[in-house]
Amino acid sequence: MAKRLDLKDVNIYYGAFHAVADVSLAVQPRSVTAFIGPSGCGKSTVLRTLNRMHEVIPGARVEGSVLLDGEDIYGPGVDPVGVRKTIGMVFQRPNPFPTMSIRDNVVAGLKLQGVRNKKTLDEVAERSLRGANLWNEVKDRLDKPGGGLSGGQQQRLCIARAIAVQPDVLLMDEPCSALDPISTLAIEDLIATLKLDYTIVIVTHNMQQAARVSDQTAFFNLEATGKPGRLIEIDDTEKIFSNPRQKATEDYISGRFG
C-alpha cells in the first residue's frame, strides 16, 4: 500500500512568480517526513504539488519530476483526480461536510466513485473510523452530522475520509494547528499508527511536533522576500535537531529566526 515519493529538480511557479526552486528529495514508504521552515518558505506549496492540489490555482505549473514508485504523477495522460485518490490530503482546519452524517462523511469519496452497496459502505466506514481511532467515540451516532463533533474528532473524521479510499500516501498540512493540546496528542498518536500502512508527509510550524512524530525532516527557507523558497537540508530527524549540517537549519530550530 505505502509507496515511495521522489522529487527531482522540482521548480514551482504561479504565473511568472518562481515560488520554489530546485527541490530534490526522497520520502520512504511507511515513514513520516516533516517539512519545517518559516512562513512563506514554500513547504506547503511543495506539499500540494505532491498530489497536484496546487493546480486549482490559475497559472500554477511545475517543472521537474514528482515520482510515485518511479511513475511521474505529472506525466502525459495522468489524471489529477486519480493522483489525489492515491495521494490523500488532510488540511490545516478540519473540513467535514457539516450537514452530512458521520458515516456519509467517511464514504463520500467511495460514493463519488460509484460505490452504492450499503454493506460495502458500512464496512469501509467502520474500518476507516477504526483506522482513525474514532470508532469507539462515534459508533452509536453514525447518522449524526459530522459538524457536531469536537475539533479534534472532526480532524480524525477527515483522516478517516482520506484513508477510506485506500491511498498510498497521506499528506497533512499543519493538521494540529487549530487543535487544543489534548486533541493534538491524539492526532500525533494516530500518525504513529498510520505510518505502519502509509507514507506520510506533514507540514508543521511546531518544532517539537516534528521531532516527536517524524523519521526525517526537511528544512525549507527563503533567501529573501520575493525570492523562491529552497530546500536547505533533509536528514534523519534526530540528526536535524541534534547536529544539522547547515547553519541556517541550526538557527531556525534554535529559535534565532522564524
From Swiss-Prot:
Its keywords, alphabetically, are: ATP-binding, Cell membrane, Membrane, Nucleotide-binding, Phosphate transport, Translocase, Transport
Q: Principal localization? A: membrane
Q: Per its UniProt entry, what is the enzyme's top EC class, as one word?
A: translocase
The record's section on PROSITE patterns has: ABC_TRANSPORTER_1, ABC_TRANSPORTER_2, PSTB
All residue ranges annotated as the ABC transporter domain in the record: 5-247
- For this chain's UniProt record, which GO biological process terms are given? phosphate ion transmembrane transport
Topological category with respect to the lipid bilayer: Peripheral membrane protein
According to its UniProt record, where is this protein located? Cell membrane
Enzyme nomenclature, EC number:
7.3.2.1
Q: Name one GO cellular component term.
A: plasma membrane
How is this protein organized at the quaternary level?
The complex is composed of two ATP-binding proteins (PstB), two transmembrane proteins (PstC and PstA) and a solute-binding protein (PstS).
Q: What does this protein do?
A: Part of the ABC transporter complex PstSACB involved in phosphate import. Responsible for energy coupling to the transport system.
NCBIfam families given in the database record? 3a0107s01c2
Family stated for the protein in its record: Belongs to the ABC transporter superfamily. Phosphate importer (TC 3.A.1.7) family.
* Designated name of the protein: Phosphate import ATP-binding protein PstB
Q: What lineage does the source organism belong to?
A: Bacteria, Bacillati, Actinomycetota, Actinomycetes, Mycobacteriales
